[in-house]
Amino acid sequence: MPHQVRWLALASLILPAAVAAAPAYVAVPLGNLGGASIYGTGINARGQISGWADTDGSGAAHRHAFLYSDGVLTNLGTLAGGTQSFGYAINDAAQVAGSSNSGNTTSLHAVIFQGGTILDLNVFLGAQVSNAYAINAGGDAAGASRSGASFRAYRYSAAGNAITTLSTFGGTTSQAYGINVFGALAGFAHTDAEDAHAFRYTDGGGLVDLGTLGGRASIGYGIAPGGEVVGSAYLPGDLGPHAFIDDGTMHDIGTLGGGSSTAFSINAAGTIVGESTDAQGSSRAFVYASGAMVDLNTVTSGLGGSTLTTATAVNDAGQIVAMSCTGPLQCQQAYRLDPAPAAKVAAIEYHHAAFDHYFITAIPDEIAKLDSGVFAGWTRTGGSFNVYAADQVGAMPVCRFFSTTFAPKSSHFYTPDPRECAIVRANANWQLEGLVFNIPVPAADGACPANTAPVYRLYNNGVGAAPNHRYTTSLATRATMIAAGWIPEGYGPDAVGMCAPV
């Protein structure tokens, strides 16, 4: 959010909310660039997808990076004179991180495709070979480059075109595959025994070895705004590997009944996607949510007989990139999996007269307890707005927090902004209660998407030594609160915080 969260007072009023299980999906085929193979790699908040595809019958010799947007698959080309390019990740500005060769060399250079131009990151890396595997909202990229015998992970900072080169855990090689909004990285680095170990890198904490699940090796592929890393790691006896999530401790998230699995991507809600073998040893794409791994083939319509074998990316709206492949990187169909339309429910506003605090909820059990007086002192204001009860294309999950710092006064804080959510989570005074509903978000100028209404966010500036926020779709209510000294927070001149579906 443009306005940083003021550190509010939250007192525990309501039971933590459960995160919804994986929804059903509808498959949208991406098409091709004229060849037989296509591979999708990344997806942004708008549902645009990066990847690469064969452009003719020559196969890998003429694979080009692509951008899929609004039903159109666009060939992003190569550096001047090149024959190959690859797209590995995409941000909300439709910048695609990848690599390309050129007429001057057959070696690949890390690049960023942006608006019809190609930025050669090798100008700043000065390497023999380089790749850009990840990119964040600020245009910072991560990958690996080689100037001698071994690759080293790097981070490219768009501000100043600065390069940060990572070390290893005593071995020769490191590579970065993921970057989050704060510039934290995920990847792997070799130990002195030349075993690959997954890492998390932050400016404050440096390069942290995440270890394994008991075996010799692990790799990190994705990193969430909160710093959680996903990837794959070997079990004792080097069995596996199994997909993992590391939130400070590495957790095995299992398989679909087979011997191996890999997690490639995680979103702000903690939804994970990847691939796993099933009980018959066949590769299947999976989604992992609410503690359960689900075969995407069992919850997806519109596949036309194809079998999804891998899923490589998931955005915060729950849209997934998945492929049907016959071998490693030999994929004949790529899809965007859109969550089936979610039900709209009302978020009801309550007021506590003694505290002069406001609270909203869309959770039926909470509404029933508030209305029946189980939670004393709260009454309906008559205000409400619509939200989605589950993942919805074009909507973001909303984090809900509380803190006992200013008890007994009670307040809750809500944000659909992954960056803001991660900032609040990092503060020891706050507790994340859950992801309580999904809602569209405004553009930077405060404009809401079609068929939605602005939800204004207002802050009481700590009146009564217990800060509180109010969320309303009413311009009259907004004006009244501002006249009473409340401060508008959000996007654009009207400080819009969310956009309620109508």
Give, region by region, the residue ranges found by the protein language model.
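Generic secretory/membrane-interface signal
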Residues: A11, P16-A17, P29, S69, ...
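Compositionally biased, intrinsically disordered/low-complexity regions enriched for serine, proline
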Residues: L13, A20, V26, A233, ...
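Residue-level hotspots at or immediately adjacent to binding/recognition sites across diverse folds
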Residues: A21-P341
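Residues embedded in well-ordered secondary-structure elements
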Residues: L10, T168, L303, A390, ...
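A generic alpha-helix propensity feature with a strong bias for hydrophobic helices
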Residues: V5, V19, V26, N32, ...
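Sec-dependent, cleavable N-terminal signal peptides
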Residues: M1-A22
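Extracellular glycan-binding segments that recognize GlcNAc-based cell-wall polysaccharides
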Residues: A342-V502
